[in-house]
Amino acid sequence: NSDFIALGEKLLDVTFAKGYTKVEKEHQDMLLDLATKIRENMSVRRVCVVEVPANAVSATYVHSDFKTGVIAVVKGSTDDQVKQFAYDCCLHMAAFTPAYLTQKEVPQSYIDEQTEIFKGQMANDEKMASKPENVKQGILKGKISKHLAEICFVDQMFVKDDKMTVTAKMAEVGKAVGAKL
């Protein structure tokens, strides 16, 4: 609906022009006007402003279903290759929906929970029964490491090159443009 798209643009314009960092009455009023006109229930749940530092680029991606949108900021260079990498990171996040940026951000309680799940799976696996305890511990550690790599953005295999992680791709792009990203 063109009215809905126009409202989205107007909401963005007002948010940036007035420096809003949370949903304001003005947002609600604008929504109510259109909701009344098109008879749809709409709301803005939150407003987030992403500031891009001087030596950085940003990219956005909105999936074709208009339900998934991603913003990425890459610091260190404004080179076109970095802009493309930022866009590719957006595609990656939309496709793989990482839960965390890095493994440092994963709560210990989550790791403990997953450890218990893997221990339970291993206890029910007949092949594991005959293995020595140190081998079981190594397998458990490997399962946890693999799982963390799957849920952490920087450790995931890159969407456009599944032979390297996001971190490795970032290093490759950084080297190509002569910058630490």
Language-model segment annotations:
Residues 1-181:
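N-terminal assembly/interaction segments in proteins that build large macromolecular machines
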